[in-house]
Design a protein with these regions (language model features):
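Hydrophobic alpha-helical bundle cores within soluble ligand-binding/oligomerization subdomains
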Residues: 2-297
Length: 297
């Protein structure tokens, strides 16, 4: 039986097998051009590969002049609304915008006051993990990577859902809203678990507060004393809004298209998307930014 401590070891036998894999796993790069095979989601001319159609969001970062791509100031639209107009709207009324924009992206129209309040209440009601989930799933095998922790937790949520395989619009909407509510909990709890077990930090698990906005709730869960300023919450809220959607052609969204097209359940599709987002050429690139700043220090 293999010793657990050597689980990650690269043995001489594995090195030999890897050599064979390299020798017999090569394809002539010229064949990709010959047969017009797209290597990833970027074409040879630098444009994104058209992989589908969406009216959920749109992003423009260049214009075409005489067949040349000319960079321009970026423009981001959610359901036809300029992101600047959306932000101006909720900032002018001193509101948090994440919930409002989530409603817009999900349902295609901006909510009125009552619809927004109902949606916020629904998000708050779903802000609760199953009994012993934190202890059994998050605490017992803390991951050093938040995307890994999220993907594993999302897959496990399947076991708690009596309608996990129901792909009707009504059920997928329910599952989606629940996951939106639970992602902050899972992410922060996993972060605290890792810091506790691997870095020796104190373990602090705050109970959820359904009355807080998503941005406020994240900061409350993250801070040992649960305290944050309004400016911090508003800045985080703005960051969440800007990162919600960007055109539908990115790697993790494409992964969701591919996986969900088989008719699989919501949890499997989202876990696959999180696996894509974890990669260093996608969302995982943010980790390199942190490492760069650490190196500068």
């Amino acid at each position: 039986m293999q010793n657990y401590n050597s689980y990650s070891e690269i043995t001489p036998e594995l090195l030999a097998l890897s050599k064979l894999s390299r020798e017999h796993g090569q394809i002539d790069p010229a064949l990709y051009t010959k047969y017009e095979v797209k290597r990833g989601l970027r074409d040879l001319n630098g444009k994104g590969v058209l992989a589908g159609l969406t009216d959920i969001s749109e992003i423009t970062s260049y214009i075409i002049e005489d067949s040349d791509m000319i960079p321009c100031d970026g423009r981001l639209y959610y359901r036809g609304y300029k992101i600047q107009d959306l932000v101006t709207g909720f900032e002018k009324e001193n509101r948090y915008g994440f919930e409002e924009v989530a409603y817009l992206l999900l349902f295609g129209q901006l909510p009125d006051k009552q619809a927004l309040e109902n949606f916020q209440q629904l998000l708050g009601e779903y802000r609760s993990l199953p009994t012993h989930f934190v202890r059994d799933i998050i605490m017992k095998a803390p991951s050093k990577d938040m995307m890994n922790a999220l993907a594993r937790s999302v897959l496990t949520m399947y076991a708690y859902d009596d309608r996990a395989d129901d792909t009707s619009i009504e059920n997928v909407v329910r599952q989606s809203i629940q996951l939106i509510s639970l992602f902050p909990l899972i992410s922060v709890y996993a972060y605290h678990a890792y810091n506790h077990y691997h870095d020796g930090a104190s373990l602090i698990i705050h109970p959820p507060k359904p009355e807080l906005s998503t941005a406020e709730h994240l900061l409350y869960l993250l801070r040992p004393d649960g305290q944050y300023t309004e400016l911090e919450a508003k800045m985080l809220d703005l960051g969440l809004v800007l990162h919600m959607e960007h055109g539908g052609g990115n790697n993790s969204t494409f992964t969701t298209h591919v996986v969900s097209s088989s008719g699989t359940d919501t949890y499997s599709a989202i876990a696959a998307a999180l696996g894509s987002l974890k990669g260093p050429k996608h969302g995982g690139a943010n980790v390199k930014v942190v490492k760069m700043f650490d190196d500068l220090k």
